[in-house]
Amino acid sequence: RRAMTEAMTQPAALIAAARAAALNAHAPYSRFAVGAALLLSDGSVVTGANVENASYGLSLCAETVAVASASAAGRLADIVAVAVIGGLMDTHGVPTGAHVVNPCGRCRQVLNEAAQMGGRDLIVHCGAAEGDAVVIYRLSELLPDAFGPADLGIVQRR
């Protein structure tokens, strides 16, 4: 693995923020709650939870909700890391399970666009609803040779 930065070696707070966000998931169809937490360059954190819709294609992933929140705050280019957790909800709506969750392909692409705006290769902390298991990646490992604005001849402004 690559040399670890502080954000890579201390994911506990970011994972905890993602777990707290997952408690706000609206997942009545899959009963699979996902939480995401974005670490911004100033140390602040923006979170999101998945929002399902009866028209399944309109559902929103937790990472996309968090990225949209960062964008609404004018902070899209400030994202340096993301933590994602998920699990099946128990009867009280609390996510459970020790299976490590990764961002889906769509979310990887959305995160990549934000990463390019900030000129960063985001750190991605993949965790579980319960337990201490965390797998850490660079976004470029999860989305190699990514398609982005440059492929369309667009130069990103920071």
Residue ranges and their predicted role:
Residues 1-2:
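Basic polycationic patches enriched in arginine
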Residues 5-24, 68, 77-158:
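C-terminal binding/interaction regions
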Residues 27-30:
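Short loop/turn motifs at secondary-structure junctions and domain boundaries
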Residues 33-40:
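Short beta-strand scaffold segments in enzyme catalytic cores
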Residues 39, 68-75:
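Alpha-helix C-terminal capping segments
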Residues 41-42, 131:
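Short strand-coil-strand connectors
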Residues 50-64:
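Compact, glycine-rich, soluble single-domain proteins
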